[in-house]
Design a protein with these regions (language model features):
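Hydrophobic alpha-helical transmembrane segments in multi-pass integral membrane proteins
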Residues: 115, 119, 190-199, 239-258, ...
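Small-residue-rich segments of transmembrane alpha-helices in multi-pass membrane proteins
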Residues: 1-4, 24-27, 52-62, 103-114, ...
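Membrane-embedded alpha-helical segments and adjacent helix-loop junctions characteristic
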Residues: 10-96, 230-232, 236-305
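Juxtamembrane and boundary regions of transmembrane helices in multi-pass small-molecule transporters
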Residues: 94, 133-177, 187, 318-372
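Membrane-interface alpha-helices at helix entry/exit sites of multi-pass transporters
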Residues: 55-60, 90-102, 131-140, 269, ...
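Hydrophobic mid-bilayer segments of alpha-helices in multi-pass membrane transport proteins
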Residues: 1-5, 17-29, 80, 182-191, ...
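Interfacial loop-to-helix junctions that mark the boundaries of transmembrane helices
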Residues: 9-20, 132-142, 175-180, 194-206, ...
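Alpha-helical transmembrane segments and, especially, the helix-loop junctions at the ends
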Residues: 69-79, 96-130, 150-154, 279-296, ...
């Protein structure tokens, strides 16, 4: 945009929302130390050890992955848990696809619960000025109902495979948990949550907790810094610049006009349904984060803006389950699985993803509109 003269360099700098980048960085530091301490592998191993049947394993994967993703970012959970799940299933001689798809979908659905669950929620949380507690309260029934629908549909679709008993005892690979480091990491996350619940700024509390984590970890900061996804931060910064360039070129104004015509309605049901349909389409065409950025300047001018912001967060998250390419979490699971000889086909995923997305979107609209 700058090279082609669409956007002057000072405008490009001004377009970057540093609140979002600071929030992401703070969360990445805390999550990075929890990764170093093997907290997520330990949590996955804990679930696997308690899954005596295929149905309980699927339930544990969907709900466990969802609840972890609700607070520690869905992409991270899929990145860490997928290899643990495959290692446990390897000797079992069972097809891993139901559990892998369950992990991806559960992580996507569960991540809707809080502003730390996924990048688009972080954007919505900051731009809507939502409180951490308020966002969580509104999204709690959405997330729990969504996880129940996801598990129920997966269990029905794969009922034939899930009826087969395990031929071998499910044994998870033991994890060497670094208890002192994990304890400090969870304590710093609890401090961050307390700060947010007390009304603290989302980015300020996140970066303060991340900095404190570096100080109290008693580990070389390089371990956590290596786990910061600098390419993602750069991607976000670049995305803000690109979207500002489109805005300067008039593309965003054109979208705004048509979006306003579509969702400006006295009926919250009609508006929420229209927003969800648009977000589901955009999220699978241009990805969910750019789709949310497109709404940044539109939503504040809409009636019931706070409701619409929550619908944007919900629909951009749930629509990630529509297709295999719908979210980064899906692609991470598919890539990790293929590297170990397990292939998730586009058609198999869509056979589950389309109905799950429609069911969870309908549930999300119903709950959010009913609760205001």
């Amino acid at each position: 945009m700058v090279v082609f003269g669409v956007l002057p360099l000072p405008d490009a700098y001004a377009a970057v929302d540093f609140d979002v980048l600071v929030f992401l960085l703070g969360m990445m530091l805390i999550v990075g130390y929890l990764e170093v301490g093997k907290f997520f592998e330990w949590a996955a191993e804990w679930v696997l050890r308690r899954a005596g049947t295929s149905e309980r394993l699927l339930l544990g994967v969907v709900v466990g992955g969802g609840l972890l993703s609700a607070f520690f970012v869905n992409d991270t959970i899929c990145l860490v848990v997928t290899p643990v799940l495959l290692a446990a299933l390897g000797p079992m001689r069972v097809r891993p696809n139901p559990y892998l798809i369950g992990l991806a979908m559960g992580a996507n659905v569960g991540s809707v619960l809080s502003v730390t669950g996924n990048p688009q929620n972080m954007l919505v949380g900051i731009w809507s000025r939502a409180t951490f507690g308020g966002f969580l309260v509104h999204m709690l029934p959405v997330a729990l109902g969504g996880l129940a629908l996801t598990y129920g549909y997966l269990r029905w679709v794969y009922r034939g495979e899930l009826r087969e008993p395990f031929r071998e005892r499910l044994e998870a690979v033991p994890v060497a948990l670094d208890r002192p480091l994990v304890t400090r990491g969870l304590a710093m996350f609890a401090v961050a949550v307390a700060g947010w619940l007390a009304g603290g700024s989302l980015p300020l509390v996140a970066i303060a907790a991340g900095a404190l984590m570096v100080l109290v970890a008693q580990r070389d900061p390089a371990y956590a810094i290596e786990r910061v996804d600098w390419s993602l931060l750069l991607f976000f910064g670049s995305l803000f610049v690109v979207m500002r360039g489109f805005e300067q070129a008039g593309a965003v104004a054109w979208i705004d006009r048509h979006a306003l015509d579509l969702v400006e309605s006295d009926s919250p049901w009609r508006a929420a349904t229209a927003v969800s349909a648009v977000m589901a389409t955009l999220s699978n065409l241009i990805s969910n984060v750019p789709a949310v950025i497109l709404w940044r300047n539109t939503v504040p001018h809409l009636p019931q803006a706070q409701l619409i912001w929550r619908v944007v967060a919900m629909s951009s998250t749930f629509s990630g389950n529509l297709l295999l390419i719908g979210s980064m979490a899906n692609l991470i699971v598919a890539e990790k699985a293929e590297a170990r000889g397990a292939r998730i086909g586009f058609g198999e995923y869509a056979r589950v993803g389309v109905p799950v997305t429609l069911l969870t979107l309908a549930w999300g609209i119903m709950v959010l509109v009913a609760t205001g």
